[in-house]
Amino acid sequence: MHAGRKTAVLIGAALAPVIAVSLPAASASAHGYISNPPSRQAQCAAGTVSCGDITYEPQSVEGPKGLTSCSGGNSRFAELDDDSKGWAVTPVPRNATFSWKLTAQHSTSTWEYYVGGQRIALFDDGGAKPGAVVDHQVDFGGLDGRQKVLAVWNVADTDNAFYACIDVNVGG
């Protein structure tokens, strides 16, 4: 091997680990969010509302089970907790369909829906792995007018859940 070629190979071998470490990693932690009616993170992804990191990761609002925040306790997505941000409000009937778009399916214990801190719907999947789209019929009962719905996807085999807030006008 010529001296110049040996030098080039050595330089290449020395730089390869540096280049590999500096390249952005592909997201292996994609999961899911409410796509319809549009959740706050769906509105961010669509550009309906100006947002930060959540614009590129609407499926990534994950946090410990039992939280009540739209951001799932994730400071990177804190704008989802801001009720004054100008979120679009979607008119829905008293018995509305909520659609989750899942980019990675996890064994699921339950799906929960809350309004004003009160659970209004619970769907038990018993550890089943869902498909790429999951629809739930949620009955708002006597609630009407503008409401903020907190939807929670509780993963069966971890201590985490996925969170989404949806601004709706029930009966509107």
UniProtKB/Swiss-Prot annotation:
The EC number(s) this enzyme carries? 1.14.99.53
Pathway assigned in UniProt: Glycan degradation; chitin degradation
Q: What are the protein's GO molecular function terms?
A: chitin binding; copper ion binding; monooxygenase activity
Q: Which reaction does it catalyse?
A: [(1->4)-N-acetyl-beta-D-glucosaminyl]n+m + reduced acceptor + O2 = [(1->4)-N-acetyl-beta-D-glucosaminyl]m-1-(1->4)-2-(acetylamino)-2-deoxy-D-glucono-1,5-lactone + [(1->4)-N-acetyl-beta-D-glucosaminyl]n + acceptor + H2O
Return one Gene Ontology term, BP aspect.
polysaccharide catabolic process
Required co-factors: Cu(2+)
Q: Which UniProt keywords apply?
A: Carbohydrate metabolism, Chitin degradation, Chitin-binding, Copper, Metal-binding, Oxidoreductase, Polysaccharide degradation, Secreted, Signal
Q: Which residues form the Chitin-binding type-4 domain?
A: 31-168
CDD domains given in the database record: LPMO_AA10 (cd21177)
**Signal sequence segment:** 1-30
Protein name as catalogued:
Lytic chitin monooxygenase
* Source species taxonomy: Bacteria, Bacillati, Actinomycetota, Actinomycetes, Kitasatosporales
